[in-house]
Design a protein with these regions (language model features):
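Conserved catalytic core of the tyrosine transesterase superfamily
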Residues: 1-321
Length: 321
C-alpha cells in the first residue's frame, strides 16, 4: 500500500496505527534539524505543489526529470522569481535526500528564472527619522532596533530577554541567518524606552504565571533538559504577542512573539504618512549609512556579495546627495 500524501490530520491520535504520512515525515525531518517554522511551512507547501503538479504521483516514483519539469514550469508559466525557484528546488532536494533517502544530485536542463540585479532601497537619515516619528510604543522600539542595531525583522521579534545586555549596550542574535550567532550594538537612544517596555512585559508575564500560563517555546531540546526554563523571565520574548495560543510545534498554550505582519503593517502606515514614495519595508530600515561601515560579520551578511551591495549603495547615496 502506498503512503498517503495528504496531511489533514495529525498522526498519533486514538487508534492511529498507520505509518506516518509523507508530509508528516517531512515535518519531522525538518524539526529534527531545527529548521525554522517558516522553512517548514515553505518546504511542505512546495512539496505538496510538486505532488499536485504530477497528478498526485508519489515522489518516490519521480526523479530528476520530473523535478526539472516542475521547476521549468514555475519559471516559464508561473514566472516566479529566481529566489522562489531556488526555494522550491531546495525543498525537493530535502525531500529526496532526508525523507525518501533517494539523493537526486544535480538537476540539469532547468529553465532558470532570471535574477534581476537591483540595489536595495536606501533611505536617508532624514527619511528614516520621519518614518520613525510616525511609529509609537512597541513599534517605535522595534523600528529603532531594525535601524540602529541592523537586525532583520525575524531576529528582532525572536529576541529573548536574556539576549539584551544593558551593561555592555549589546544585543546577542542567536541562530540568525545561516544559523550563526553574532553580537550587535544596542542603540543608546532606545535604552530608556526598552527598559520601560520590559517592565510592562514582566508584569504581563507575572499575570500569565498567576493564571497558570507563562510558558514560552524553547529552542531545540532545551525544554527537555531544563523543564522549568520555559517559565523563566530570561527566556521570555522581548516582544510578546497580545494573546496566548497553542503552537503546533510546541504543544502547551504559550505566549508567542509578535507576528511579523503587525510590524510590516505599522511601518507601511508610517511610510504612507511620511509621504515617502520609495518602496519601504522593515528590512529597509536595516540599510543606513552609519551601519554600512561596520564589518560584514557584525552585520550578519553570510557572503561578500551583501557587503559589496551595500558599498554600491554608499556610492549611489553619495552621488545623489
Amino acid at each position: 500500500m502506498s503512503e498517503r500524501l495528504t496531511a489533514k490530520s495529525e498522526p498519533g491520535g486514538p487508534g492511529d496505527a498507520s505509518p506516518p504520512k509523507l508530509l508528516d515525515r517531512v515535518r519531522d525531518a525538518i524539526r529534527t534539524r531545527h529548521y525554522s517554522r517558516r522553512t517548514e511551512v515553505a518546504y511542505v507547501t512546495w512539496i505538496r505543489r510538486y505532488i499536485v503538479f504530477h497528478r498526485k504521483a508519489h515522489p518516490s516514483t519521480l526523479g530528476a526529470p520530473e523535478i526539472c519539469a516542475f521547476l521549468t514550469w514555475l519559471a516559464t508559466k508561473r514566472q516566479v522569481s529566481a529566489s522562489t525557484q531556488n526555494q522550491a528546488l531546495a525543498a525537493l532536494l530535502f525531500l529526496y535526500e532526508h525523507v525518501l533517502q533517494m539523493p537526486i544530485g544535480q538537476v540539469e536542463h532547468v529553465v532558470r528564472a532570471k535574477q534581476p540585479l537591483r540595489l536595495p532601497v536606501v533611505l536617508s537619515r532624514e527619511e528614516v527619522a520621519v518614518v520613525l516619528s510616525h511609529l509609537e510604543g512597541t513599534m517605535w522600539i522595534i523600528g529603532m532596533l531594525l535601524y540602529g542595531s541592523g537586525l532583520r525583522l525575524e531576529e528582532c521579534l525572536e529576541l529573548r530577554v536574556k539576549d539584551i545586555d544593558f551593561d555592555r549596550n549589546e544585543i546577542m542574535i542567536r541562530r540568525g541567518k545561516g544559523q550563526k550567532d553574532r553580537a550587535t550594538t544596542l542603540p543608546a537612544a532606545v535604552i530608556d524606552s526598552l527598559c520601560q517596555h520590559l517592565a510592562e512585559v514582566k508584569r504581563l508575564h507575572s499575570a500569565d504565571l498567576a493564571d497558570g500560563f507563562g510558558r514560552v517555546a524553547l529552542p531545540d531540546a532545551l525544554g527537555r533538559k531544563y523543564p522549568h526554563a520555559a517559565v523563566e523571565w530570561g527566556w521570555q520574548f522581548v516582544f510578546p504577542a497580545s494573546c496566548i495560543c497553542r503552537d503546533p510545534r510546541w504543544g502547551p498554550p504559550s505566549r508567542f512573539h509578535l507576528h511579523a505582519s503587525a510590524v510590516q503593517k505599522a511601518i507601511a502606515v508610517a511610510v504612507r504618512r511620511s509621504g515617502i514614495a520609495k518602496r519601504v519595508g522593515p528590512h529597509t530600515m536595516r540599510h543606513y549609512a552609519g551601519f554600512r561601515t561596520m564589518p560584514s560579520d557584525v552585520k550578519g551578511h553570510s557572503r561578500a556579495g551583501g557587503t559589496l551591495l551595500l558599498k554600491a549603495e554608499i556610492r549611489f547615496a553619495a552621488h545623489s546627495a
